[in-house]
């Protein structure tokens, strides 16, 4: 799930922290990708024309392998060096979110049994998609044969991605989960592994710009996310993104906010703090996540194991041999090039002051309002 409405809040309050990029922009960059999130996308999106998942002769799904193979090739073609990070065991506190997902799953299964229209059946089937251990195992085998590094995190994949980015092992963490920002990755990329056919630009979030423009510390930003609701606990019921930001800026911490609620200094019939709220434990998971220290992680991009790759993808999984061989050549070509020095690596970029960031944020907001106003006028015409 990530953090509810956080992307909307940043888009409205700090639009200058989000850049829309073409994939070519990231040539020469190393990126740590949330593999579990990517596999989930592939299982939903990579399908036949009738909406059914791809499968081999044995009837087992192969959508995850096709997505992993071709989306990785696309990145390699554009000079990006991807590494994938897989989820480990979820933290105990995540049981809250997992229980919610289980209830939603049971509800969807009941609706699927009652569905009669094909479109409705496919919609419910997609909602039931789940990344299973064997999907992860096959994806890891594929990556090994392709020569692409991967890491199995002790717990949350996005936390491990952020750890690699913070240390400079990679340029950015790539995930659809906005809670990646709470783990203090310098840069978050969204939509990196989306299909090219969707024509969605890659979103680049600059964490420092977000923190500085909102004038929040990392701890306060995490508290903001917890107010909105995260994977580890419920948020304050009835509080939307604008009021969540007001609360944290006015009171400074969740402890102070909870105290004000308990004393009756903050009162709203629509707002309610969850009973037995474990916000401190949730905050600790963001501040001190269970990760492998980056100095213990070695990332190596190697020559693909051509014969073994053909054996696995063609003979075992039924993929077209010519296409797999073509993919192997693309891998060889892309990985030989290496990570070239980018022009911006020769210059030290001075961080902007809070005043400069505030001015940039105001300009971006004004531009957004003007664009929205023009759109309304055009619709009237």
Swiss-Prot record:
Instruction: Give me the stretches of Basic residues compositional bias.
Output: 365-381
- Cellular component, GO annotation: mitochondrion; nucleolus; nucleoplasm
Q: How is the cofactor bound?
A: Binds 2 magnesium ions per subunit. They probably participate in the reaction catalyzed by the enzyme. May bind an additional third magnesium ion after substrate binding.
Which Gene3D superfamilies does UniProt cross-reference here? 5' to 3' exonuclease, C-terminal subdomain, 5'-nuclease
Question: Where do the segments described as N-domain lie?
Answer: 1-105
Its needed co-factors are: Mg(2+)
Q: What class of enzyme is it?
A: hydrolase
Q: Which controlled-vocabulary keywords does the entry list?
A: DNA damage, DNA repair, DNA replication, Endonuclease, Exonuclease, Hydrolase, Magnesium, Metal-binding, Mitochondrion, Nuclease, Nucleus, Phosphoprotein
Stretches for region Disordered: 360-381
Give me the residues that bind DNA, please: 47, 71, 156, 229, 231
Modification comment: Phosphorylated. Phosphorylation upon DNA damage induces relocalization to the nuclear plasma.
Which segments carry the region annotation I-domain? 120-251
Annotated region Interaction with PCNA: the residues are 339-347
**Which is a GO BP term held by this UniProt record?**
DNA replication, removal of RNA primer
The organism's superkingdom is given as Eukaryota
Could you state a single Gene Ontology molecular function term?
Answer: 5'-flap endonuclease activity
Q: What is its main location?
A: nucleus
Binding positions (Mg(2+) 2): 177, 179, 231
Oligomeric form and interacting partners? Interacts with PCNA. Three molecules of FEN1 bind to one PCNA trimer with each molecule binding to one PCNA monomer. PCNA stimulates the nuclease activity without altering cleavage specificity.
Q: Which family does it belong to?
A: Belongs to the XPG/RAD2 endonuclease family. FEN1 subfamily.
What HAMAP family would the database entry show? Fen (MF_00614)
Described purpose of this protein according to its UniProt entry: Structure-specific nuclease with 5'-flap endonuclease and 5'-3' exonuclease activities involved in DNA replication and repair. During DNA replication, cleaves the 5'-overhanging flap structure that is generated by displacement synthesis when DNA polymerase encounters the 5'-end of a downstream Okazaki fragment. It enters the flap from the 5'-end and then tracks to cleave the flap base, leaving a nick for ligation. Also involved in the long patch base excision repair (LP-BER) pathway, by cleaving within the apurinic/apyrimidinic (AP) site-terminated flap.
What protein name is recorded for this chain?
Flap endonuclease 1
Corresponding gene? FEN1
């Amino acid at each position: 799930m990530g953090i509810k409405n956080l992307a909307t809040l940043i888009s409205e309050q700090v639009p200058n922290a989000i850049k829309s990029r073409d994939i070519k922009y990231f040539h020469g960059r190393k990126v740590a990708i949330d593999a579990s999130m990517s596999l989930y996308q592939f299982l939903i999106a990579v399908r036949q024309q009738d909406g059914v998942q791809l499968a081999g002769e044995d009837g087992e799904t192969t959508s995850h392998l096709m997505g992993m193979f071709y989306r990785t090739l696309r990145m390699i073609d554009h000079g990006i060096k991807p590494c994938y990070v897989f989820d480990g065991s979820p933290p105990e506190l995540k049981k809250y979110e997992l229980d919610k997902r289980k209830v939603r799953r049971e509800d969807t299964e009941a609706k699927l049994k009652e569905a009669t229209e094909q479109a409705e059946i496919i919609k419910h089937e997609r909602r039931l998609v789940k990344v299973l251990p064997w999907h992860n195992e096959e994806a890891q085998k594929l990556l090994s044969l392709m020569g692409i590094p991967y890491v199995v995190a002790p717990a949350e994949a996005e936390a491990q991605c952020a750890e690699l980015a913070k240390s400079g092992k990679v340029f950015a963490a790539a995930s659809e989960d906005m809670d990646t920002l709470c783990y203090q990755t310098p840069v978050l990329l969204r939509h990196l592994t989306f299909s090219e056919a969707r024509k969605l630009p890659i979103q680049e979030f600059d964490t420092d710009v977000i923190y500085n423009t909102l004038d929040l510390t990392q701890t306060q930003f995490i508290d903001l996310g917890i107010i909105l609701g995260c994977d580890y606990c419920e948020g304050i019921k009835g509080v939307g993104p604008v009021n969540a930001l007001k609360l944290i800026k006015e009171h400074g911490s969740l402890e102070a906010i909870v105290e004000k609620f308990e004393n009756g200094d903050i009162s709203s019939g629509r707002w309610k703090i969850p009973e037995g709220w474990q916000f401190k434990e949730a905050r600790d998971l963001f501040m001190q996540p269970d990760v492998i220290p980056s100095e213990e992680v070695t990332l190596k991009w190697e020559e693909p194991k051509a014969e073994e790759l053909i054996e696995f993808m063609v003979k075992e999984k039924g993929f077209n041999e010519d296409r797999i061989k073509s993919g192997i050549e693309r891998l060889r070509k892309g990985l030989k090039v290496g990570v070239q020095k980018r022009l911006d690596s020769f210059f030290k970029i001075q961080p902007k002051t809070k005043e400069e960031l505030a001015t940039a944020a105001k300009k971006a907001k004004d531009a957004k309002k003007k664009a929205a106003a023009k759109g309304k006028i055009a619709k009237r015409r």
